[in-house]
Amino acid sequence: MEQSNDSLRVNHNDGEESKTSAQVFEHLICMDSRDSSFGQNDSPTVLPITTREANNSLISQNIPGPLTQTQTLSAEQFHLVDQNGQAIQYELQSLGESNAQMMIVASPTENGQVLRVIPPTQTGMAQVIIPQGQLVDVNSPRDVPEEKPSNRNLPTVRVDTLADNTSNYILHPQTSFPLPKKSVTGMLEEPLLGPLQPLSSNTPIWACRLRSCEKIGDSYRGYCVSETELESVLTFHKQQTQSVWGTRQSPSPAKPATRLMWKSQYVPYDGIPFVNAGSRAVVMECQYGPRRKGFQLKKVSEQESRSCQLYKATCPARIYIKKVQKFPEYRVPTDPKIDKKIIRMEQEKAFNMLKKNLVDAGGVLRWYVQLPTQQAHQYHELETPCLTLSPSPFPVSSLEEEETAVRDENCALPSRLHPQVAHKIQELVSQGIEQVYAVRKQLRKFVERELFKPDEVPERHNLSFFPTVNDIKNHIHEVQKSLRNGDTVYNSEIIPATLQWTTDSGNILKETMTVTFAEGNSPGESITTKVETNQTRGSLSPEPTHLLSSLSSFQPKIFTQLQGLQLQPRYTSPDESPAVVSVNNQPSSSPSGLLDTIGSAVMNNNSLLLGQSHSLQRDTCLTQNNSTASTMGNLPEPDQNLVAMDELVEVGDVEDTGNLEGTVHRILLGDVQTIPIQIIDNHSALIEENPESTISVSQVKQEPKEPALSMEAKKTVDYKKLSAT
C-alpha cells in the first residue's frame, strides 16, 4: 500500500438490537483512494477481520460480500480489503478464559504466505497488520490502554473520536481521529526509510545507521528520530574515524520557532513541512580546525603578524546537527512528473492548514546529521584505530579512486573541493583577486552559471562546490605559496580579454605599475626591481596586466616573460650621470632627427618608440598633442616594435631631475603592448648617436617654463658636454 495515495475508510452504521444486547458494529475498510468508487456511500465488499464474542470459542472468519443491517451480529466487526479488493485471511484465537485474543494475519510474499501473530496485552484491543506492513491499532470503548505493543520496524496509527453523529470518515496514512464511543490517544512512530540515493557497497557502517542517508561530497547526511539514536551514531562515527571534535556552535534556548519551511541548508526537501527546533544548528569542528580568537590569543596573533610567520592551514572537517519538527500528515507529493503548479498549490494549502493548527499539529522530531568521512580531514594525520571493527572499515571504491586521481592531476593541493572549483581559485589568485569574500562571490557565480544548469545546481551545503571561508583561505594560501616558489606556471589562455580590478564597492580600479631598476655591482649581475602603484585613467592590455600582476609575486619571472628583452647594467654619460634608455644595434640615422623626436616624446609625456630597422624621421611634429601620433605614423606597421629579439634595453635610476616628476612613459613590446614606466624624479633627456650605433640618453638642464625644445634649439646644443658611451 503506498503511503501517500492510500487511505482508510471507516463507515459507522447503527445496527439493530439483538436479543441479548444492543450492539454497534463498524466497518474498517482499506481502500485505494485512486479507486473510482472511493468516497461513495454505498457499502463495498469487505472482509471482517476481528470479532470479539461473549464466549471464548475459536472464531475463524472469511466472509466475502457486503454486510447489511439485517445480519445478526453480537460483536463489533472490522473489515479490511487491500487496494485490489482482495480479502485478507485471518484467524482470531482466544487466550485462556479471558477476553484477550490473539490475531493471526496471513500476507502473501514471494516465498509464500507469511503468518504474523500479534498478541494484545489487554482485552478489547485488536491489532491488524495490512500486507504493506502498516500497523493499525483500534481501542475498545470499555478499556483504553496507555501502552500498546508495537513492532519497531512498522509505523503505528491510532484512531480517535471526531464526532458522535459522523457516519463516514476518511483516514489518511499517519493521521489519527476518533470513532464514536471510542476513546483513543494517538502516537506516530516513523519507519526506517531507505536511502534517497543508492549507496555504494563501501559505505561506512556509521553512515548506514542514518535514516534516508545520502552522500554529499565527502560527507554523509541523514537523520535520527531520538537523542539516543543520535548519540549512538556520533559515538560510532568517532570510534571509526578516530577523530576528536569540539563544539563550535550550539543552539540557544530561544523561543520556539514558528516559521514553516520545506527545506533548508541542513534539511533536504522530502515533501514534508517542518519548523526548526532551536535557533541554530550544532556545529562541531575537528580538533585541528580553526583556532578561536579569544583574549589570550590576541598577543600570539600580534607576535605572529610581526614576525611574518607563515599562514597555518587548519582542518575544514565539520559535523552539523539540526533539530527540526516534521509534520508528515501534511505531506505533499514529490513525484517529478506532477505539474509544479499543482505542487505549489498543495504546499500553500498545507501551510495554511498548519498555521491554523500549529499548536495542536503534533508532528515528529528529527535530528538531521551531516558526518564527514576521513577524506574530509586535511593538513593533519589521522590516528590509526587501536581496534578495527572490520577488516576494511573505509575501502576506497573505483569511483573514489578515479576522483582522487583526477584531483591529483588537476590540482596539486590536497583538497576536498571539486577540481574545477580549486582550479578557479588558482585562476582568481593569479589574476590578483585574493580577498576571501571576493573569491567566494566569484566561485558561487562560477558554479551556478557555468558548471551547472539552473535546475541542476547543487545545494549550498555541498562543500565540494561551495567551500567554506576556511577552505578558501587555505587554497589562497597554497596558491600564493606556489607562486612565490615558481611552481605555478601562468596560462595566458585563462586571462580574460579585458581584465579589471574592482574595489569592495564594485568600482573599477585602474592602476599603473611604477618599476624602478637598481644597478648591479658588476655587468653580469641581475638587476633588482622595486614596484609601486599609482592610479591613472588609462587601462592596460591583457598581456602587460598579466605580466605586471605577477611581478609582485616573483620578480625574477618578469625576465622570462619578456624573452628577447634583456636587462644589462646601465650606461653612464661622461659627467657620470646615469643614462635612461640604451638600445643596441640601431641603424645609423640623423642625430638631430632622433633628438627632435625622442626629446619631444619624453618631455611631452608620450610614448617612447624605437624602431628596430627604421629610424625616426626629421619632420616629426613636435607639438604636445600630436607628437606620438606623428611618430607612430612615420613608422611602418610591421616595424612598430620597441625592442626586438636581438636588442638590449637598459633602464636605470634617475637622479636630480627637473620637471618630469609624475610623468608616465611606455615601452612598447613586440605586439604593440605597453609597459608604463613612471619617472619619479625631474629631468629631461637628450640623445646622440655614437660611432658604435648605440643610442644613449643623458641628462641636461631644462628651463621650468619651456614646454618643448624647438628644432633649432636642439641643433645648437653643445655636444661637447656629451660623449659616446
From Swiss-Prot:
Keyword Nucleus attributed: yes
The protein, known as: Calcium-responsive transcription factor
Organism: Homo sapiens
GO BP: any one term: regulation of transcription by RNA polymerase II
Biased composition (Low complexity): 577-592
Coiled coil: none
Domains as described in the record: The N-terminus is necessary for DNA-binding. The C-terminus is necessary for transcriptional activation.
Residues covered by region (Disordered): 572-592
GO molecular function, one term: RNA polymerase II cis-regulatory region sequence-specific DNA binding
Pfam families, sorted: ALS2CR8
